[in-house]
């Protein structure tokens, strides 16, 4: 008999199965639109279960050591194969044979050390080959000779000591050759002659310690348009030699950034005279001195970058010869910290006079003392001038500050971060073409009279945000009616409520920013006349009082008339009320920001006109209820909603509609699952609003009629049940009476028709009492004759028949009611029923009840279906306990017997 396996074997078998399942599920490639992404999956082999029609395969960041050609047979349509960041050490020629349409092959960051002549023999359609960051130290023979369509070859970050990549002419279509970060120390014609038929647009040799440029090295290349030698530690003399070697070449772009070019002499770029160089990058080269006429050899130059240097002096001939320069970057070019103004970098007058074609000048982040009368003289085509953080003592802008720009068609002027404190009248009067003026982030503190902007006839935007303080007047902007964008954020704005409004002269205004000014008082004419306004920023002010119904004169409708407004920001104003007509005129509004206020209950029709709203922000308010009557119109076409951090009341009345909406809409709702939480009731506190169960909250409107009908039916049913329970006997009794009336029963009350005054119904056990008390009455009054069963029933007649006949011949029927009668079966089943029937046929008071005992009404009804309420009071008698009251009882009985059988 076999022994059972130990428990730990089962345990480890289960763990192994679980690990295999988890591993297989984790190693799943993502396939979308013929692109397979298998990156970061720790793959050791090529997946074999991908669609055969994929054109892009990403295998980066795995553990591949080979790219077996057989594994790519099923993926023959691949055009891009990325195998970067693996451990591939060898490429097999058959790879491209199985991938005939391959155009881009990326094998960067692998362990490839050698390339044979056969490696790429079948890669004839390859256009890009990336082999950067491998271990290739030398290229032997001609591994790239068959790559006739190759456009880009990247061999950077290898250990190459030479630029020689082949022994014969090849790579005739190559445009980019990247050899940066290698160990190349010299450039010779023999090492570059394989490019004799190539037209290189970019030769990247940066971060190589090149110490020699052999004669004719660049002429060995068929055509060279761009050369990068950044971070090559080129000295001034080596740079001059480089330029000589570039003479008479097709060079257009030359980048020499991050070198050791501390001085540029008159001869440094002389070798470039016979070129068409258009772009020169000399940034981060520790440049201090530029001799006169240094750039005289570059008449075709259009772009010059000198940023991040330490130039001491710019003379009137520093830029001589740059007659075609269009873009000049001098950012951080003159930076040198100094306490003394005399030792600050110096710019002579007329330094830019030679730059007749200059359109863009960037002089940001420098340390100039000020602007002289002729600093920018000669810039007759300048359109963009940035002087941000450029001056150490430019405190006041006078009418002479920009005199040197009088002849320039300047469109943009950036003066931010210069500690400017005052703008004098006519300071910009020379800049009649200016469209954008940026004065932000300064220390301006003054009253704006309007003369500051005199002469800005074409101004479109004025940026004054983040200054010390600005006091407005009625005429503050009368000189700039063309203004379309006005930024006044965080300027401690004063006198905003002046009348007429300071913004009334701006009929073309499209954007107005008045945020972060603690504005507390405005009038309803503040924005009057701004019919073209599209964007209004009023956040971070104190406008809450203006919209209160308790405000003297009522809410201030300062938004009226803005029929073209599209974006409105009213966040952080302390609003706790919104007038019902606050947004009435804003029919084209696309975005409203009311976040970080104190709003709780909004008027029902406040958003009725905002049917085009796309974005609504109400975050961090006190909103508890989101109902359709308020938010329905606003949510109709909404694309973005932000109502985070509101204390939602999670009840059917408050958010049922909202929950249904957010669970069915395609609107982008920020952080819905985390920051839309219930606050009340307590059992839902902290519960996500989107998970609130609305099934008990079905809209009652469609079922209201049904509810009312059901309720009425239920109430009627309960009423009938109670009526039957308490008065059913009465209804039954009168129903029977009515039926017999309808059937034509007539009242019979003729004395001669009856033989007996009354028929006495009693229990058999009570016969002695009946005989004892009724016989003496007959003896006393001979007109009274009672029908007693023991005495008056005919012999030989059936008892039941005798009872019927006797009842019919009796004028009245007397019930002697005792406990015995209630238990007597004959009385219960026949006598009482027949007597009641007779009473109904004759009339309603032909029955007399004599109670010998106290019998509750419910017992009487239960046993005999009789109730005291069915009879007149004189027909209900109680046998007296006291003997002296017996005569009175007899008198009452005679009265009852003598009463006429009238209708009850």
Curated annotation (Swiss-Prot):
InterPro entries named in the record: Cys-rich_flank_reg_C, Leu-rich_rpt, Leu-rich_rpt_typical-subtyp, LRR_dom_sf, TIR_dom, TLR3_TMD, Toll_tir_struct_dom_sf
Keywords, sorted A to Z: Disulfide bond, Endoplasmic reticulum, Endosome, Glycoprotein, Immunity, Inflammatory response, Innate immunity, Isopeptide bond, Leucine-rich repeat, Membrane, Phosphoprotein, Receptor, Repeat, RNA-binding, Signal, Transmembrane, Transmembrane helix, Ubl conjugation
LRR repeats: 53-74, 77-98, 101-122, 125-146, 149-170, 173-196, 199-220, 223-245, 250-271, 276-297, 300-321, 324-345, 357-378, 381-401, 409-430, 433-455, 466-487, 508-529, 532-553, 564-585, 588-609, 612-633
LRRCT domain location: 646-699
Membrane topology per record: Single-pass type I membrane protein
GO CC aspect terms: early endosome; endoplasmic reticulum membrane; endosome membrane; plasma membrane
Glycyl lysine isopeptide (Lys-Gly) (interchain with G-Cter in ubiquitin) crosslink location in chain: 812, 831
LRRNT domain: residues covered: 27-52
Gene3D superfamilies from the UniProt entry: Ribonuclease Inhibitor (3.80.10.10), Toll/interleukin-1 receptor homology (TIR) domain (3.40.50.10140)
GO terms, biological process: inflammatory response; innate immune response; signal transduction
TIR domain residues: 754-897
Location in or out of the cell: Endoplasmic reticulum membrane; Endosome membrane; Early endosome
Residue list for modification Phosphotyrosine: 759, 858
Record field: transmembrane: 706-726
Post-translational note: Ubiquitinated by TRIM3; leading to recognition and sorting of polyubiquitinated TLR3 by the ESCRT complexes. Ubiquitinated by ZNRF1 via 'Lys-63'-linked ubiquitin chains; leading to TLR3 lysosomal trafficking and degradation.
Topological domain spans for side Cytoplasmic: 727-904
GO molecular function: RNA binding; signaling receptor activity
PANTHER family reported for this sequence: PROTEIN TOLL-RELATED, TOLL-LIKE RECEPTOR
Notes concerning its domains: ds-RNA binding is mediated by LRR 1 to 3, and LRR 17 to 18.
Binding partners and assembly: Monomer and homodimer; dimerization is triggered by ligand-binding and is required for TLR3 signaling. Interacts (via transmembrane domain) with UNC93B1. Interacts with TICAM1 (via the TIR domain) in response to poly(I:C) and this interaction is enhanced the presence of WDFY1. Interacts with SRC; upon binding of double-stranded RNA. The tyrosine-phosphorylated form (via TIR domain) interacts with WDFY1 (via WD repeat 2) in response to poly(I:C).
The protein, known as: Toll-like receptor 3
Organism: Boselaphus tragocamelus (Nilgai)
């Amino acid at each position: 008999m076999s022994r059972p396996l130990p428990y730990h074997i089962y345990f480890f078998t289960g763990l192994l199965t679980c690990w295999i399942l988890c591993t297989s599920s984790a190693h799943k490639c993502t396939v979308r639109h013929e692109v397979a992404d298998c990156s970061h999956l720790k793959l050791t082999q090529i997946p074999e279960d991908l669609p055969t029609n994929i054109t892009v395969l990403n295998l980066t960041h795995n553990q591949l050591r080979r790219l077996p050609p057989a594994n790519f047979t099923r993926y023959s349509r691949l055009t891009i194969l990325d195998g970067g960041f693996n451990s591939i050490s060898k490429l097999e020629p058959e790879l491209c044979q199985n991938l005939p349409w391959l155009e881009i092959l990326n094998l960067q960051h692998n362990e490839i050390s050698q390339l044979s002549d056969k490696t790429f023999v079948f890669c004839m359609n390859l256009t890009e080959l990336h082999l950067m960051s491998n271990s290739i130290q030398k290229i032997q023979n001609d591994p790239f000779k068959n790559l006739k369509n190759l456009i880009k070859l990247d061999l950077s970050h290898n250990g190459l000591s030479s630029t020689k990549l082949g022994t014969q002419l090849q790579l005739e279509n190559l445009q980019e050759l990247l050899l940066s970060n290698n160990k190349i120390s010299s450039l010779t014609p023999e090492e570059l002659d394989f490019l004799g038929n190539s037209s290189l647009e970019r030769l990247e040799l940066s971060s190589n310690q090149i110490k020699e440029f052999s004669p004719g090295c660049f002429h060995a290349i068929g055509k060279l348009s761009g050369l990068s030698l950044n971070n090559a530690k080129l000295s001034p003399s080596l740079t001059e030699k480089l330029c000589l070697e570039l003479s008479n070449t097709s060079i257009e772009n030359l980048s020499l950034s991050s070198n050791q070019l501390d001085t540029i002499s008159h001869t440094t770029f002389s070798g470039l005279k016979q070129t068409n160089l258009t772009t020169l990058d000399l940034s981060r080269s520790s440049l201090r001195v530029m001799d006169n006429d240094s750039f005289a050899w570059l008449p075709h130059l259009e772009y010059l970058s000198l940023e991040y240097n330490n130039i001491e002096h710019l003379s009137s001939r520093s830029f001589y010869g740059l007659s075609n320069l269009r873009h000049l970057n001098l950012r951080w070019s003159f930076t040198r910290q100094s306490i003394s103004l005399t030792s600050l970098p110096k710019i002579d007058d007329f330094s830019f006079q030679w730059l007749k074609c200059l359109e863009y000048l960037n002089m940001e982040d420098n340390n100039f003392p000020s602007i002289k009368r002729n600093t920018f003289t000669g810039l007759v085509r300048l359109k963009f001038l940035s002087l941000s953080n450029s001056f150490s003592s430019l405190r006041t802008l006078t009418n002479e500050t920009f005199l040197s720009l009088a002849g320039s068609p300047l469109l943009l002027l950036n003066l931010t971060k210069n500690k400017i404190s005052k703008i004098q009248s006519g300071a910009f009067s020379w800049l009649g073409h200016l469209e954008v003026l940026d004065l932000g982030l300064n220390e301006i503190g003054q009253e704006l009279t309007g003369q500051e902007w005199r002469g800005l006839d074409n101004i479109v935007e004025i940026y004054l945000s983040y200054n010390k303080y600005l006091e407005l007047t009625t005429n503050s902007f009368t000189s700039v009616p063309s203004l379309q964008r006005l930024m006044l954020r965080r300027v401690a704005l004063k006198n905003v409520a002046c009348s007429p409004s300071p913004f009334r002269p701006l009929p073309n205004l499209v954007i107005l920013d008045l945020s972060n000014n603690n504005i507390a008082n405005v009038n309803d004419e503040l924005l009057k006349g701004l019919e073209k306004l599209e964007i209004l920023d009023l956040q971070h002010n104190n406008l809450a009082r203006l919209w209160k119904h308790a405000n003297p004169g009522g809410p201030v409708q300062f938004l009226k008339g803005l029929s073209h407004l599209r974006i409105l920001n009213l966040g952080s104003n302390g609003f706790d009320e919104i007038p019902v007509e606050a947004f009435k005129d804003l029919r084209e509004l696309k975005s409203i920001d009311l976040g970080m206020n104190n709003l709780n209950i909004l008027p029902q029709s406040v958003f009725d006109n905002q049917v085009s709203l796309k974005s609504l922000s109400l975050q961090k308010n006190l909103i508890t209820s989101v109902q359709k009557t308020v938010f329905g119109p606003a949510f109709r076409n909404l694309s973005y909603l932000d109502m985070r951090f509101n204390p939602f009341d999670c009840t059917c009345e408050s958010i049922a509609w909202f929950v249904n909406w957010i669970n069915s809409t395609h609107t982008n709702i920020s952080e819905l699952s985390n920051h839309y939480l219930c606050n009340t009731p307590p059992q839902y506190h902290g519960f996500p609003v989107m998970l609130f169960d609305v099934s008990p909250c079905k809209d009652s409107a469609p079922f209201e009629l049904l509810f009312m009908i059901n309720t009425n039916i239920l109430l009627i049913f309960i009423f009938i049940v109670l009526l039957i329970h308490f008065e059913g006997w009465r209804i039954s009794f009168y129903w029977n009476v009515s039926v017999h009336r309808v059937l034509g029963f007539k009242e019979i009350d003729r004395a001669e028709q009856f033989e007996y005054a009354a028929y006495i119904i009693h229990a058999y056990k009570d016969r002695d009492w009946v005989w004892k008390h009724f016989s003496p009455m007959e003896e006393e009054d001979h007109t009274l004759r009672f029908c007693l069963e023991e005495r008056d029933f005919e012999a030989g007649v059936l008892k039941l028949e005798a009872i019927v006949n006797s009842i019919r011949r009796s004028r009245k029927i007397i019930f002697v009611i005792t406990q015995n009668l209630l238990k007597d079966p004959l009385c219960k089943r026949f006598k009482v029923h027949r007597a009641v029937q007779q009473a109904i046929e004759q009339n309603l008071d032909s029955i007399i009840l004599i109670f010998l005992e106290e019998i509750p009404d419910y017992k009487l009804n239960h046993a005999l279906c009789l109730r005291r309420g069915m009879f007149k009071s004189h027909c209900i008698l109680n046998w007296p306990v006291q003997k002296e009251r017996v005569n009175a009882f007899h008198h009452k009985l005679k009265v009852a017997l003598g009463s006429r059988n009238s209708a009850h």
